[in-house]
Amino acid sequence: MIASVRGEVLEVALDHVVIEAAGVGYRVNATPATLATLRQGTEARLITAMIVREDSMTLYGFPDGETRDLFLTLLSVSGVGPRLAMAALAVHDAPALRQVLADGNVAALTRVPGIGKRGAERMVLELRDKVGVAATGGALSTNGHAVRSPVVEALVGLGFAAKQAEEATDTVLAANHDATTSSALRSALSLLGKAR
């Protein structure tokens, strides 16, 4: 497999770049953001994923290994092929897409052309636990984002209204950024029990 390509940029098109390496021109599909960093006549290096099909071998290029790994993770979802995975990475960069998946943000996923509500829900279900999220220093810690969705889902499963569950979970996570899923669930249940 071809893991990376380095060489002179011969052509930059709307959806791909041609990079000459050792006398061979490699056509590498890439997102608009990646293509915008490349200039004809300059040297470039892209981390690649090679997708082999019965009738084709296609290279997809990425600025770093993290983005390539996320692309390959997206392909593990039933119904998500290389084009759809690239579309997702064109709309959301890798850190943002990881955050969207970790948060279970179906609305953000449906902004990707070709991903409907059902497809977005399937992606969240299959990938939420597979994608790690880098620390961001936002209002909620990374742990808070990762813990919030499962706690809210558990509370809704126990019969609480979604709004009630979200408010209780947010209150608990605001007070304790480092709460685990189980401790946050216990605290939220305690809070909701007092409210009843």
Swiss-Prot record:
Give the location of motif Acidic pin in residue numbers: 54-55
Protein's UniProt keywords contain Cytoplasm: yes
| Sequence segments annotated as region (Domain I) | 1-63
UniProt-annotated stretches for the region Domain III: 146-196
Quoted from the entry, the domain comment is: Has three domains with a flexible linker between the domains II and III, and assumes an 'L' shape. The position of domain III with respect to the tetramer is variable.
Stated family: Belongs to the RuvA family.
The protein's job, in short, is: The RuvA-RuvB-RuvC complex processes Holliday junction (HJ) DNA during genetic recombination and DNA repair, while the RuvA-RuvB complex plays an important role in the rescue of blocked DNA replication forks via replication fork reversal (RFR). Binds HJ DNA. RuvA specifically binds to HJ cruciform DNA, conferring on it an open structure. The RuvB hexamer acts as an ATP-dependent pump, pulling dsDNA into and through the RuvAB complex. HJ branch migration allows RuvC to scan DNA until it finds its consensus sequence, where it cleaves and resolves the cruciform DNA.
Q: What is the official name of this protein in its record?
A: Holliday junction branch migration complex subunit RuvA
Native organism is Mycobacterium tuberculosis (strain ATCC 25618 / H37Rv)
